[in-house]
Amino acid sequence: MSMTASSSTPRPTPKYDDALILNLSSAAKIERIVDKVKSLSRERFAPEDFSFQWFRSISRVERTTDNNPSAATTAAATATVHSSVSSSAAAAASSEAGGTRVPCVDRWPFFPFRALLVTGTAGAGKTSSIQVLAANLDCVITGTTVIAAQNLSAILNRTRSAQVKTIYRVFGFVSKHVPLADSAVSHETLERYRVCEPHEETTIQRLQINDLLAYWPVIADIVDKCLNMWERKAASASAAAAAAACEDLSELCESNIIVIDECGLMLRYMLQVVVFFYYFYNALGDTRLYRERRVPCIICVGSPTQTEALESRYDHYTQNKSVRKGVDVLSALIQNEVLINYCDIADNWVMFIHNKRCTDLDFGDLLKYMEFGIPLKEEHVAYVDRFVRPPSSIRNPSYAAEMTRLFLSHVEVQAYFKRLHEQIRLSERHRLFDLPVYCVVNNRAYQELCELADPLGDSPQPVELWFRQNLARIINYSQFVDHNLSSEITKEALRPAADVVATNNPSVQAHGGGGSVIGSTGGNDETAFFQDDDTTTAPDSRETLLTLRITYIKGSSVGVNSKVRACVIGYQGTVERFVDILQKDTFIERTPCEQAAYAYSLVSGLLFSAMYYFYVSPYTTEEMLRELARVELPDVSSLCAAAAATAAAPAWSGGENPINNHVDADSSQGGQSVPVSQRMEHGQEETHDIPCLSNHHDDSDAITDAELMDHTSLYADPFFLKYVKPPSLALLSFEETVHMYTTFRDIFLKRYQLMQRLTGGRFATLPLVTYNRRNVVFKANCQISSQTGSFVGMLSHVSPAQTYTLEGYTSDNVLSLPSDRHRIHPEVVQRGLSRLVLRDALGFLFVLDVNVSRFVESAQGKSLHVCTTVDYGLTSRTAMTIAKSQGLSLEKVAVDFGDHPKNLKMSHIYVAMSRVTDPEHLMMNVNPLRLPYEKNTAITPYICRALKDKRTTLIF
């Protein structure tokens, strides 16, 4: 068909949504996946395949010591590469120098497994198959990336206590394993113990052993941790109790059906690692799955042509990190003959064809050709010309500011942010603010790291230079380097934490501590997989504080890199949107069941604070006030009794009246209305005041309008005369909380309908800002401050799968966020820890918890806790790399491929273009299809062959 047909002939308005029709048409075949998975998961391994103690024998490794270096040298000289698994590999295991652990591969059994391949175009419905599997089967759902895992959590509507995890966290990977996996020395050493060369991997047994060797430093560390814990449990209790404790270590003990999303980002050997740990944990815990001899069934979901799996190596001596393209799991299952035959891929491949994220037919046809590597037609190339815009426009931050910019490299993203910040400083300086990022370095651990990395070095490298060179590794999320960071790093010495605590009052309240609206547990904070950490640290040694500053833009589009703890404290949006949320119970419905009471309490607090707006809106007249006073106010026993007691009390103490309607006091100059942005730019403050919570005092002798209003019952809101501020949830039963919520909601909706009728519908379009039981002040530096010095709300989490708007920051105490003081140096706590405030798509405001992370470095077989960083865990959605955008759906996209892009690949083009949900909102600086690019030709023949194979399950 013609690629321009849609532009020449207008299409009739469909009766049903296109996405709905496409999903319904594929539903029947998606259900067949369940039957296929059931069949694969019934496989059993033979009882003689494993002895009960197999995990003990394979974990025993030989280590050399400094006392006998000749033995290591002799063993290394005799180590040879064999074409089969033999006892000589075990002898070679004792040859390891430098403390790197190597396995005794002659004792390894073969770990059988089954695999199902699920691939398809971007937005074609692969996630739908995961939803169906989760609904119909008992399976372990995971993702390769944090974004993929959190996206699945949202789609599957998982509760806060059952969030989807990454596959790495499921099998026990923690931050200390990052340097173990990247160590160049370890990988060079382990290469000597491969049972054969890659081209000689003619059997699945050889392939499995070589793949496990590639990841052995991490495997060995996790295995040792588990075995040590098992032995301690067995020594203090019974073997059965130890096995039961081990069974709770990993979700891999829950089911033999393991679903992994975005497998195109996972290296080939990780498939065998997952299989290994499935057997390890189940054998260690003697689980039902192990006793029934269940073979693991791995469901690999993703696209082999969208992105690449990257392999990284880090050299401590040169401090260089090399990154190269590796073979991902999906490509291996499609191309590797050994895996194809063993997994019977021809019969176990499900392929989704059409794009449902963007239902434009011409655009979908183009993406289909790009996904499968089919040679493009001339009309495809010509079709992309329509998206080209001048490069100067895309690189100009003021042009189409609402569009997300995508670039090939981090350098280009940094350059764009610098241009953006410079432009904002000239026109909207009040939108810029910067916050400190702290790094507390343990001097003793850093000194030891330098000695291990360079034993012959005269003096250690300056710590601030090391910090700058390793910033992307220390701040463990890739997009951190894209932010506009200060070039200057301040360095200062810190006293030992114990001395600081002894000097100051030890009972000082921790920042962020205190009472909690949601309870004392503080939510489901993800902790390390193993609590007993053998990393070397020196808590009482001297420490160095490194500080740099990071610049943010108020109103910019942002995301988070991982599930971050947050507190919902308010709402900011239009009155109409807030009413829609109330009528549909949107916030209540999206809240997990165990938090229902807290959700009702929070929305009740927002409604209480928002009631003032009916009396102070720009459209309010005396006639409207009379009508508002007639709205029925039902009795709420928990609120009215306290109000009656207050009314019976003497006159207002200190001249404070709960009916003060002091709102936006600095909002005018000379009787003229001044825009909020202009007031903020002139250093003034915007106040959102709740009458009965106001602490405003005016010492002037002049009689103000507010004082005159106090004597006029017309301007006294009967709502605040009848009801007091809602108490905390701990003082109310669930029934009382729900009754309070429904009463406030009904009053608000009645008032809204009245105002709509009297204003001709204009009231709905007004902006509404309301905070939970608090008055707030917006300061000129983007700081949001509570007049009580604290915020209270509902503990929740923000997800990397969602996009948020940055509203500013607060330095006030957040009562609902548990304290992190025990993880942060007390001198850093004393300086005050600011928290960012985000707004989600519905308009709810979140206070984001600070991100505290420990950086553990491994060198010469020793793990060192070198430093702890305190930052904000934020990534920008205003601009990002194309690789980072993988898995996201973006409304408006502007892609900059550069002037003369090098190493441009079809995967880059495909991922960048397929992020958009509507091609009308896509622009690019060039037509990348007219430039030289690397084609995905290697995998195309396999995909084309599968499309023609009747055994392949095709879902359109």
Swiss-Prot record:
Cell compartments where the protein resides: Host nucleus
CDD domains for the chain: SF1_C_RecD
The protein's name: DNA replication helicase
GO biological process entries: DNA replication
GO MF: ATP binding; helicase activity; hydrolase activity
Sequence segments annotated as region (Disordered): 658-694
Keywords: ATP-binding, DNA replication, Helicase, Host nucleus, Hydrolase, Nucleotide-binding
Ranges annotated as biased composition (Basic and acidic residues): 679-694
Protein family (similarity comment): Belongs to the herpesviridae helicase family.
Domain of life of the native organism: Viruses
Cellular component annotations (GO), alphabetically ordered: host cell nucleus
Protein task: Component of the helicase/primase complex. Unwinds the DNA at the replication forks and generates single-stranded DNA for both leading and lagging strand synthesis. The primase synthesizes short RNA primers on the lagging strand that the polymerase elongates using dNTPs. Possesses helicase-like motifs and therefore may act as the helicase subunit of the complex.
